[in-house]
């Protein structure tokens, strides 16, 4: 279920402070975060945010189509290697 409109979007305060500082300085360095649950807000457009996927930080360049989505949606946590093919089916 989506979040109630009266509550507004959720964003961790430590991430919000880093975003505001980067916008103020016009800094293009990636912002490293573990907060996959934070929502992308319009202030983040044009920034690169390194989102942790459990193993490493995946760089995510934020565009205007991403506003309203969560950061974790753009850093996959699982690697799919495909199903093992049956040897009899190959013949």
UniProtKB/Swiss-Prot annotation:
GO terms of biological process kind: ribosomal small subunit assembly; translation
Keyword Ribonucleoprotein: yes
Sorted UniProt keywords: Ribonucleoprotein, Ribosomal protein, RNA-binding, rRNA-binding
Gene Ontology molecular function terms on file: rRNA binding; structural constituent of ribosome
CC annotations in GO: cytoplasm; small ribosomal subunit
InterPro entries: Ribosomal_uS19, Ribosomal_uS19_bac-type, Ribosomal_uS19_CS, Ribosomal_uS19_SF
PANTHER family the record matches: RIBOSOMAL PROTEIN S19P FAMILY MEMBER, SMALL RIBOSOMAL SUBUNIT PROTEIN US19M
Function as written in the Swiss-Prot or TrEMBL entry: Protein S19 forms a complex with S13 that binds strongly to the 16S ribosomal RNA.
Family membership noted in the UniProt record: Belongs to the universal ribosomal protein uS19 family.
Protein name: Small ribosomal subunit protein uS19
Gene name of the record: rpsS
């Amino acid at each position: 279920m989506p979040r109630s409109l009266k509550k507004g979007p959720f964003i961790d305060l430590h991430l919000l402070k880093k975003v505001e500082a980067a916008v103020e300085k016009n800094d293009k360095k990636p912002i490293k975060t573990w907060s996959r649950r934070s929502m992308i807000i319009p202030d983040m457009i044009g920034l690169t945010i390194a989102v942790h996927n459990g193993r490493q930080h995946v760089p995510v360049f934020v565009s205007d189509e991403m506003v309203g989505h969560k950061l974790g949606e753009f850093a996959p946590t699982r690697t799919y290697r495909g199903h093992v093919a049956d040897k009899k089916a190959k013949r």
